[in-house]
Design a protein with these regions (language model features):
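HhH-family (HhH-GPD) DNA N-glycosylase catalytic core used in base-excision repair
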Residues: 1-215
Length: 215
């Protein structure tokens, strides 16, 4: 739950970076960026492409149920944890397709092989600067800049990462570019310059606030 970070200080720093975010920060003050497992985050964001949130959740649940271990919760209810690299590496592409991941099945296989072989690991990524880490992640089939930035932010603790999807592009254009169509790369560069190491936090406040308020 990212309890080691002082969110009071983080919120003050985000507002200091841009006073226009005060309302967003105040209204969405409970937002936290969770410290999530790298491998699960990688696969989940590969699955997320062109899917709705309910569909993504169902696919991840299907993968966990098919390949993960059963765990009994405190109330006696059974659930399944996300499988480790070995378990998913042993899965066939056809078995993955049965989890309703569609065209993403070969991407999941490629990502799993990259992690299993040691070509792309959390340890390697942690040693690189953010640009190098993004480039290494994008050697995995199906991982573009947006997915790579999401993995950096949510699965590797790189809080300076600023993922830009269709929604975030629209939000940033309206708030900072007078509504003009702007390239995602230019938006990301602007965010890096404006928010620095706070980029991921600013992105989360902006994303949640704007989706429920501006549109």
């Amino acid at each position: 739950l990212d309890m080691d970070n002082d969110y009071g200080l983080i919120k003050q720093s985000v507002i200091k970076a841009d006073g226009a975010l005060k309302t967003a920060v105040d209204e969405k003050s409970g937002i936290r960026i969770l410290n999530q497992d790298f491998f699960e985050t990688l696969i989940s964001f590969i699955v997320s492409q062109n899917k709705s949130i309910p569909q993504i959740k169902q696919c991840v649940k299907n993968i966990s149920h098919r390949f993960g271990d059963e765990v009994i919760g405190y109330n006696g209810e059974a659930f399944y944890v996300f499988p480790d690299v070995q378990r998913l590496h042993d899965a066939t592409e056809e078995e993955l397709r049965e989890c309703k991941v569609g065209f993403r099945a070969p991407y999941i296989k490629n990502a799993t092989e990259a992690v299993y072989s040691g070509a792309v690991t959390k340890e390697k990524l942690d040693e690189l600067d953010i640009a190098q880490a993004r480039e290494l992640l994008m050697t995995i089939k199906g991982v573009g800049e947006k997915v790579a930035n999401c993995v950096l932010l949510f699965g590797l603790g790189r809080r300076e990462a600023f993922p830009v999807d269709v929604w975030m592009k629209r939000i940033m254009e309206q708030m900072y570019f007078d509504g003009k169509d702007t390239k995602k790369q230019d938006i990301e560069a602007f965010a890096v310059n404006k928010f620095g190491d706070l980029g991921g936090y600013a992105q989360q406040y902006l994303f949640d606030y704007a989706r429920t308020t501006l549109f």
